[in-house]
């Protein structure tokens, strides 16, 4: 069979019969990526990476380029969809113990970090008020690095402040990183197919597997259709639902935006960053909030892979989900009285649940279930 490998990749791949809708998000992410690369290319064709022209070039795209408004909206809304899907995909991995497939999990978290970097660079490109101040705030985090901080920041900016060289290099990075994402995704899929998908029971029933196509591919197609329908509803009716009003005015280095809130995608991480008053401490907490996911296979103390039969861990899991939603909400609010303390408590409970309560609950469940 000459095309054996390609067939094995999608057609003849043996998959458990009982995987649920939570397993459809991988193919949805692949579709998001394809959409982002396609629309991104057409946007890049009309974009000008110059601080005096960037904002105008996007206005020109939306107004004058045929279907430019569609490309721009699809790219912006598609990015938010990408993040919604990836967070659900990770939550599924946490719930069903998919992180026990270590190589796949590590490549996935690396993908998440690359994706967040790409989204940040993309957010800077329109050169609106929020773009400019987000760039200022986030790049200034590098100054928290001891000894090298200031030199690193100057090197990244290409000068002593955010200026034309900064925008040019951010555009270059935003263009090249998706290719890294594509290669990492391919690696992610290849590594997954080494061991095969998990399933809600957390078992590996080799005797009860069916081919991916046509059984699961049609199920994937259903969720894909729903996602594309959502995109096509949001695009014409609520195109600016994920945008920030401040980003509709051109960047002005002299007037700071009211509250520099990060994009919807990274609001959860931003809340953790600013809940710590110390600069270096905040940066470390920000990094730790994502890097802690690398530790998940080490923190797994249960004898059962999945949380399906572990009620205590389930309660903790849904508390963690709620916690992340609270962090996301706080991250989009101004830094004032109630939000500061809420953010600090939510950040604390985030790390507490992952690093302490999950392993302890699993040990207790082992005892209760006499495993």
UniProtKB/Swiss-Prot annotation:
Disulfide bonds: none annotated. Signal peptide: none annotated. The keyword Transmembrane applies. Keywords: Electron transport, Heme, Iron, Membrane, Metal-binding, Mitochondrion, Mitochondrion inner membrane, Respiratory chain, Transmembrane, Transmembrane helix, Transport, Ubiquinone. One of its GO terms (cellular component) is respiratory chain complex III. PROSITE patterns: CYTB_CTER, CYTB_NTER. Its main location: mitochondrion. It is a multi-pass membrane protein. Binds 2 heme b groups non-covalently. Heme 1 (or BL or b562) is low-potential and absorbs at about 562 nm, and heme 2 (or BH or b566) is high-potential and absorbs at about 566 nm. Component of the ubiquinol-cytochrome c reductase complex (complex III or cytochrome b-c1 complex) that is part of the mitochondrial respiratory chain. The b-c1 complex mediates electron transfer from ubiquinol to cytochrome c. Contributes to the generation of a proton gradient across the mitochondrial membrane that is then used for ATP synthesis. This is Cytochrome b. It comes from Loxocemus bicolor. The gene is MT-CYB.
């Amino acid at each position: 069979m000459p095309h054996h490998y390609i067939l094995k990749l999608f057609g003849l791949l043996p998959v458990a019969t009982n995987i649920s809708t939570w397993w459809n998000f991988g193919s949805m992410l692949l579709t998001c990526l394809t959409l982002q690369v396609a629309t991104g290319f057409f946007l890049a064709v009309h974009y000008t990476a110059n601080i005096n022209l960037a904002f105008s070039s996007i206005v020109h795209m939306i107004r004058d380029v045929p279907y430019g408004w569609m490309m721009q909206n699809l790219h912006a809304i598609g990015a938010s969809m990408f993040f919604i899907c990836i967070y659900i995909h990770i939550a599924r991995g946490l719930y069903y113990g998919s992180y026990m497939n270590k190589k796949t999990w590590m490549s996935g978290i690396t993908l998440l970090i690359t994706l967040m970097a790409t989204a940040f660079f993309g957010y800077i490109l329109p050169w609106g008020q929020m773009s400019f101040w987000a760039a200022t705030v986030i790049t200034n985090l590098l100054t928290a690095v001891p000894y090298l901080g200031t030199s690193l920041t100057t090197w990244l900016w290409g000068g002593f402040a955010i200026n034309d060289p900064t925008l040019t290099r951010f555009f270059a990075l935003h263009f090249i990183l998706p290719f890294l994402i594509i290669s990492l995704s391919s690696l992610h899929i290849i590594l997954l197919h080494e061991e095969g998908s998990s399933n809600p029971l957390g078992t590996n029933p080799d005797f009860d597997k069916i081919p991916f196509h046509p059984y699961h591919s049609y199920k994937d197609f259903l969720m894909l259709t729903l996602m594309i329908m959502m995109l096509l509803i949001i695009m014409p009716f609520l195109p600016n639902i994920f945008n920030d009003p401040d980003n509709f005015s051109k960047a002005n280095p002299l007037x700071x935006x009211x509250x520099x809130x990060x994009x919807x995608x990274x609001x959860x991480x931003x809340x953790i960053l600013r809940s710590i008053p110390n600069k270096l401490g905040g940066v470390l907490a920000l990094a730790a909030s994502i890097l802690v996911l690398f530790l998940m296979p080490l923190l797994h103390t249960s004898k059962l892979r999945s949380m399906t039969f572990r009620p205590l861990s389930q309660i903790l899991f849904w508390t963690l989900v709620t916690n992340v939603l609270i962090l996301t909400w706080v991250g989009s609010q101004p830094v004032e009285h109630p939000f500061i303390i809420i953010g600090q408590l939510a950040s604390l409970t985030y790390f507490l649940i992952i690093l302490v309560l999950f392993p302890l609950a699993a040990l207790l469940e082992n005892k209760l279930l006499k495993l």
